[in-house]
């Protein structure tokens, strides 16, 4: 479960906030207190690039630093467009079984180089800016990845960024659509 405010905590919870990016009637019917938000992800200490990339799938594809799951740009059997109205101010909602982010988690990252979380192939994902340059990286691969230093490293290493492209009509940015550049493990 996330460590920040959201309307998905439900009225009466200390972290509940009134919806600002959606409305109560547009929100998914579930609320966080009814779910066990625990998850585990085992990744190599030093992840490596795979010989070929692989597509992300439905469900959790990573874990954010807030403790909630990261999902790709799909919702059910289609694009996120129709479900975008259910997303809270931080680009997340509940469904089918957990609170998760699809869009840049504005609870702690908004157009910056902050750590977002870890993707299930073991590579970290950061905000839209590069810590090494202080600007939007111009050398990203199709997954939003490149090799440079980060706020947590002194030597250059491969990592992902939220790609600086507005998603559809949301005025926000997808956290990670993929494909994976490493070998993914399951988030359980």
Task: Tell me what each language-model feature is.
Residues 78-88, 95-136:
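Short helix-loop boundary/capping segments
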Residues 138-188:
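Long, compositionally biased interface segments
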Residues 1-79:
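Solvent-exposed N-terminal domain segments of exported/luminal and surface proteins
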Residues 31, 91-92:
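Short consensus segments that form the blades of beta-propeller domains
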Residues 43, 90, 143:
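Short clusters of hydrophobic/aromatic residues that line enzyme substrate/ligand-binding pockets
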Residues 51, 70, 107-111, 125, ...:
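Short loop/beta submotifs within extracellular cysteine-rich repeat domains
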Residues 39-46, 64-69, 95-108, 153-168:
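Extracellular/lumenal glycan-associated surfaces
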């Amino acid at each position: 479960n996330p460590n920040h405010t959201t309307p998905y905590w439900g009225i009466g919870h200390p972290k509940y906030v009134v919806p600002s990016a959606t409305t109560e009637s547009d929100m998914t019917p579930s609320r966080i207190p009814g779910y066990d938000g625990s998850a585990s992800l085992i990744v190599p200490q030093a992840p490596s690039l795979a010989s070929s990339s692989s597509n992300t799938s439905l469900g959790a594809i990573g874990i954010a630093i807030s403790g909630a799951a990261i999902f790709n740009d799909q919702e059910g059997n289609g694009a996120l467009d129709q479900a975008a109205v259910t997303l809270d101010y931080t680009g997340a909602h509940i469904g089918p079984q957990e609170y998760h982010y699809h869009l840049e988690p504005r609870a702690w990252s908004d157009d910056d180089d902050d750590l977002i979380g870890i993707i299930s192939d073991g590579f970290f994902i950061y905000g839209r800016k590069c810590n090494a340059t202080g600007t939007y990286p111009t050398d990203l691969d199709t997954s939003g990845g490149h090799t440079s230093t980060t706020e947590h490293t002194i030597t250059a290493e491969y990592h992902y960024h939220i790609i600086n492209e507005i998603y559809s009509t949301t005025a926000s940015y997808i956290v990670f659509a993929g494909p994976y550049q490493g070998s993914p493990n399951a988030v359980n």
